[in-house]
């Protein structure tokens, strides 16, 4: 496995490079393993469902209502990487593996059977900005040989981002609302805050922190944002409903940094800034 640089030329004229660990494969992959949910959501816009043989979560029927790809992956094997037996994946004859970049240093130890099989691997950093989402779409388009579909997806995503930005600019500064994400992993929420014009009261805190009712009461946000479905080292599960007596309005979103983040942004803006949609 060697390091190469993938160059992505974006439809709006921006050029990026994304360096990933990737073993070159001239054949179009059709037995893909993808662990990050956000990458799964992008891939399902680029390749047929039957080209994916393993995803980074088990099936959860209750999540079909919320996750745009849960129903699509119903018949696909899956588990969180912490609970994955790579010998089971090997039986599916994978020809491309998409992993989160934090596993790159320990990949051989975590997945010894896959490592010995020398299956092409892409280690991808989770996007934190709109531009990084676009870059990730192009990277996945490149490694799956679906560059044209990736270009079309990026162009559509960029148009939706521009529509959101036009709405965000209409929000008077004195009407921007404050918000707290009621979940310990905070790094993805700032992107949504930036795109919707809300003020993230936990922006200056660590990316991982315990969020308690006492902390929320101390910060007194205008709204509390919760996740529809949680996916972490404990598995996949629906979170407990918020405190019914809470004085703060609650909005639930998915918070996956893929093209579907647009849906999260509209969900928030329609509820907290309804005047933007009354024309």
Regions found by a protein language model. Give the residues of each.
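Bacterial N-terminal signal peptides
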Residues: 4-15
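Boundary at the C-terminal end of the N-terminal hydrophobic targeting segment
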Residues: 17, 21-23
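Basic- and aromatic-lined ligand-binding clefts that recognize polyanionic substrates
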Residues: 28-47, 149-206
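Structured C-terminal subdomain patch of bacterial secreted/periplasmic proteins
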Residues: 30-31, 77, 84, 128-142, ...
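A short, structured surface patch at a secondary-structure boundary
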Residues: 31-92, 96-105, 201-205
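Short secondary-structure boundary segments
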Residues: 36, 101-102, 183, 227-231
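Short, solvent-exposed loop/turn elements at domain surfaces
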Residues: 40-45, 60-65, 99, 186-191, ...
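Extracytoplasmic ligand-binding site segments that recognize negatively charged/polar headgroups
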Residues: 62, 105-109, 125-139, 172-194
């Amino acid at each position: 496995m060697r390091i190469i640089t993938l160059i992505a030329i974006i439809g709006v004229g921006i050029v990026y490079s994304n360096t990933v660990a990737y073993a070159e494969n001239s054949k179009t992959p059709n037995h893909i393993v993808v662990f990050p949910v956000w990458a799964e959501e992008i891939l399902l816009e680029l390749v047929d469902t039957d080209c994916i043989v393993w995803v980074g979560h088990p099936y959860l029927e209750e999540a079909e209502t919320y996750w745009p790809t849960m129903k699509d992956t119903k018949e696909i094997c899956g588990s969180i990487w912490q609970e994955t037996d790579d010998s089971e994946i090997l039986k599916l004859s994978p020809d491309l593996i998409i992993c989160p970049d934090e596993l790159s240093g320990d990949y051989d130890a975590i997945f010894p059977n896959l490592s010995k099989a020398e299956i092409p691997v892409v280690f991808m950093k989770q996007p934190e900005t709109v531009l990084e989402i676009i870059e990730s779409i192009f990277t996945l388009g490149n490694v799956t040989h679906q560059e044209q579909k990736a270009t079309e997806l990026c162009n559509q995503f960029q148009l939706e981002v521009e529509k959101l930005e036009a709405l965000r600019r209409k929000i008077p500064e004195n009407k921007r609302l404050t918000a707290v994400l009621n979940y310990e992993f905070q790094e993805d929420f700032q992107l949504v805050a930036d795109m919707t014009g809300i003020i993230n009261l936990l922006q200056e805190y660590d990316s991982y922190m315990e969020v308690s009712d006492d902390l929320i009461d101390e910060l007194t946000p205008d709204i509390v944002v919760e996740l529809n479905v949680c996916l972490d080292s404990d598995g996949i599960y629906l979170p407990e409903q918020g405190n019914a007596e809470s004085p703060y309005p609650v909005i639930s979103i998915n918070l996956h940094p893929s093209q579907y983040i647009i849906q999260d942004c509209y969900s928030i803006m329609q509820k907290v800034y309804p005047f933007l949609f009354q024309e």
